[in-house]
UniProtKB/Swiss-Prot annotation:
The keyword RNA-binding does not apply. One of its GO terms (molecular function) is structural constituent of ribosome. The lineage of its organism: Bacteria, Bacillati, Bacillota, Bacilli, Bacillales. GO terms for biological process: translation. Disulfide bonds: none annotated. HAMAP family: Ribosomal_bL28. Keywords: Ribonucleoprotein, Ribosomal protein. SUPFAM superfamilies: L28p-like. It comes from Geobacillus stearothermophilus. This is Large ribosomal subunit protein bL28. Belongs to the bacterial ribosomal protein bL28 family. GO terms for cellular component: ribonucleoprotein complex; ribosome.
Amino acid sequence: MAKCFITGKKKSFGNTRSHAMNASRRDWKANLQKVRILVDGKPKRVWVSARALKSGKVKRV
């Protein structure tokens, strides 16, 4: 998946552990939403994290 246009958030990697502590590789995806925002005065559709939207770092068009 893409990364956040504002914060640069992207998916992170690690292990999931079973009860027996066996490791399996997995990834955690950031909560990204595709929104239209103004970039250089023009509307553009970009991936933005939900946290950036909630905190008001982005103004939707």
